[in-house]
Curated annotation (Swiss-Prot):
The active site is at K226 (proton acceptor), E275 (proton donor). SUPFAM superfamilies: ADC synthase. The lineage of its organism: Bacteria, Bacillati, Bacillota, Bacilli, Bacillales. This is Isochorismate synthase MenF. Catalyzes the conversion of chorismate to isochorismate. NCBIfam families: isochor_syn (TIGR00543). It comes from Bacillus subtilis (strain 168).
Length: 471
């Protein structure tokens, strides 16, 4: 467990240095303090030069919590091709916490997502034949940032993470940390003209439509119940794509979604997902069943009519029930108590309405958030049902490399609080190109053209964030 202290700053720096000398290797000091208001996008933009390729952005629905990480002070990685990848990251994190020191100035800094925080995500399927576009994205990639901004209802907090060795001078470490945190200022982010979409290509569209026909035939033959098939849109721009304007548009337009970005060696995976996979707050865990979708209406009356149509649509209700059942069973196996409502309600984003059922549980002491990620991913909303068979089908007939699309992405802090979203409504940006992804659930009576139109709707948030409709 991370040593968390509020006593005299100097004394605790000495404690950390003594520990480093005792174990004969460096330990991490994580120094947190409350600061004046600081814009998260400005902070993210500030890191573009010094920390380019090593930044992370996270904002939950309604921006109740925003976390921005710059640099990689500690890296946790796995290339395990099975479920052991979750345990490997968890065990690396547990070992790290044993020699990490969180030093803060005030009692109120004992806040979720302040101090040592692990950012990152996993691939959708570690056994897929990975496309080169996903180079540098491992089966699991996580890091503790060098600098971190945490925006909460209680205000903004800055965390500085630094390795120290037993031979360092305590006064130098002390003054260096305090001076950096006290004087930290960044220029305001200023919106610049974004590159313009020059070309758009729907990759393997015909193969994707044929895959739906194959899937519906197999489902009718009772080979499986459901599979989610995704497709890819390749956009080419007239210049390099800047990530900050993309994030700003997503934050402005997709306020009921998780907005995220993670950089890896010149590539940025970015998106606005409406779907929570798992959240842990103390002993309470929460997940969202989000399956079954339809477009928004042109006005309030039309929107209400379309929403009622979704709430009474047998295909979408069946698809939703499959997801609810799977998530509920996963919670029952890891929780002492589980609660879920009797039926779904509507969850509305700017472009899409979804059937939504929340599930809440009390996690057993022996379980971790990584245990639930392993049990939940991929849910039937992202893979299909039965889980293992659906993933096999995706490998066989889906004409794209998923990489991190539709996979868990999020954070966990030193107290094991954390949250992971499902990385949908997303895209992979590199230079002047953007690969956008969207999928839909295929069941027995799915129609290829109708499913294609559904993916068109789901692509809209990212197309808009990148500069508008295709030109």
């Amino acid at each position: 467990m991370v040593t968390t202290v509020q006593r005299t700053f100097r004394k605790e720096v000495l404690h950390a240095l003594h520990k480093a000398k005792e174990v004969n290797h460096a330990v991490l000091i994580s120094y947190s303090r409350q600061i004046e208001s600081l814009d998260p996008l400005s902070f993210f933009n500030y890191g573009a030069k010094k920390y380019t390729g090593n930044r992370f952005f996270w904002s939950d629905p309604e921006s109740e919590l925003t976390i921005v990480g710059l640099g990689k002070e500690a890296v946790f990685q796995t290339n395990q091709k099975n479920s052991e990848r979750y345990r490997e990251v968890f065990e690396q994190w547990e070992r790290f916490k044993k020699t990490a020191f969180h030093i803060y100035e005030e009692e109120k800094l004992q806040h979720s997502a302040v101090g040592p925080v692990l950012f990152g995500g996993f691939s959708f399927d570690p056994c897929e034949e990975r496309g080169s576009q996903w180079d540098h994205f491992s089966e699991g990639d996580f890091f503790v940032p060098a600098l971190m901004l945490t925006m909460t209802a209680e205000g903004p907090f800055l965390t500085v993470n630094r390795w120290v060795s037993g031979g360092e001078d305590a006064e130098a470490v002390l003054e260096g940390l305090k001076a950096f945190a006290a004087e930290f200022m960044v220029p305001d982010f200023k919106q610049e003209d974004q590159a313009v979409i020059a070309a758009a290509e729907e990759l393997d569209k015909d193969d994707w439509l044929k895959a739906i026909e194959t899937a519906t035939s197999q489902i009718k033959e009772k080979q499986y119940d459901k599979v989610v098939l995704a497709r890819e849109l390749l956009l080419t721009f007239d210049g390099p794509i800047q990530i900050e304007p993309v994030l700003k548009t997503l934050l402005d337009d997709q306020q009921t979604s998780y907005v995220f970005a993670i950089e890896q060696e010149g590539k940025t995976f970015v998106g606005a997902s409406p779907e929570r996979l798992i959240k842990r707050d103390g002993g309470t865990v929460m997940s969202s069943c989000l399956a079954g979708s339809i477009k928004r209406g042109v006005n309030e009356e039309d929107d209400r009519r379309i929403g009622l149509e979704l709430l009474n649509d047998e295909k979408n209700l069946l698809e939703h029930d499959i997801v609810v059942g799977m998530i509920h069973n996963a919670f029952v196996s890891s929780c002492s108590e589980v609660e879920k409502p009797d039926g779904p309600v509507l969850y509305k984003t700017k472009s899409v309405q979804h059937l939504f059922t929340p599930i809440v549980g009390q996690l057993r002491e022996s379980a971790s958030i990584f245990d639930l990620i392993e049990k939940l991913h991929p849910t039937p909303a992202l893979g299909g049902s039965p889980q293992e068979k659906a993933v096999d089908v995706i490998r066989e007939i889906e004409p794209m490399s998923r990489g991190w699309y539709a996979a868990p992405i999020g954070w966990i802090d030193s107290q094991d609080n954390g949250e992971f979203a499902v990385a949908i409504r997303s895209g992979l940006i590199e230079g002047s190109t953007a690969r956008l992804f969207a999928g839909c659930g295929i069941v027995e009576d799915s129609e290829p053209i109708s499913e294609y139109e559904e993916t068109q709707i789901k692509l809209k948030p990212m197309i808009s964030a990148l500069g508008g409709e295709r030109r």
